[in-house]
């Protein structure tokens, strides 16, 4: 079990590194990686023009559990929304436009595939 957790952690970290490089190549400016606060963690916070972008990175080595981007369900969206509001307020960036993107990274033996889903979801309210 420890090996599996280590493998998952490695997959996640590699996916985040690849996503950050991909976003920079696409013109995003990375502001934070693995930002943590009392509400949780967000993988990447970046700037795309005048927009602050909160990016969730999902990485998979196989399709056994479905497409990576499908792992960002309502609970995860709620958590990311809370973190984003906290970040914008504490950094005094709440006058900026914000957006939620997902980067899906598929790491397979035949090669890597990175997909950027802009505006993947809206700000989630509730609970």
Swiss-Prot record:
- Show the GO MF annotations: nucleic acid binding
User: Which Gene3D superfamilies does the record cross-reference, listed alphabetically?
Assistant: 3.40.1350.10
* InterPro entries linked: Restrct_endonuc-II-like (IPR011335), tRNA_endonuc-like_dom_sf (IPR011856), UPF0102_YraN-like (IPR003509)
Q: Which domain of life is it from?
A: Bacteria
Family according to the record: Belongs to the UPF0102 family.
The record, for PANTHER family, names: UPF0102 PROTEIN YRAN (PTHR34039:SF1)
Q: What name goes with this protein?
A: UPF0102 protein SYNAS_23220
Q: Please spell out the taxonomic lineage of the organism that makes this protein.
A: Bacteria, Pseudomonadati, Thermodesulfobacteriota, Syntrophia, Syntrophales
